[in-house]
Amino acid sequence: MERRTFMNVTAGAATAFALNPLALAQEQARKTPVLYPDPAVEIIDPRFAKYKVGNAAVERLYTGARWAEGPVWFGDGRFLLFSDIPNNRMLRWLEDTGEVSVFRSPSNYSNGNYRDRQGRLLTCEHDSRRLTRTEYDGTITVLMDRFQGKKLNAPNDLAVHSDGSIWFSDPGYGIMSNYEGHKAPFELPANVYRLDPNTAAVTVVADDMDKPNGLCFSPDEKKIYIVDSGVP
């Protein structure tokens, strides 16, 4: 290739690249980690300061979900599963390649996900109004879809105790509109339940919240923290 031809080709490629600054910015944003903790985050209670991880960064793994929810990590497979509620699907991110693919579609407008003590996937499904478990062979077992003969609202989020019991919130967001499920009448109050998967025994552990949502146990499991997203 002559020097003049080479220069023209190079200049053309550079011009084409320069004409797409949006793609460049998006790629740079995806690759550039953000220092953690973000200086824009204000700590109100000084007791929280000890939980900061100073020598860490935040990296964007995926852009393209309408509403990403319920991430759950599978360390044995080196992948992350999460729900994309309005798109009615679950996605999987692979650590080795960074590739994101569809894990389950339709997902019954899945929301929260967790792993039980045996490592199986537990999922709160809005549209089917149930709590399910994905078995090792990929089949799905319905753990609970009714309480006292009435349909659950739309299970939202969950946590698993070391005794194997499954605690989940049922605020009903998935039946309030057709955006994250399908609109339907409420048959039960917005409760938080404890399910023993071995005996199928169910207990209402909280019935005085407007919209119980995310929940987690304290490290010693003597307390459970529940977010009431219905409180202004």
Give the role of each language-model region:
Residues 2-14, 24-232:
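Sequence-structural signature of mature extracellular/luminal beta-sheet repeat domains
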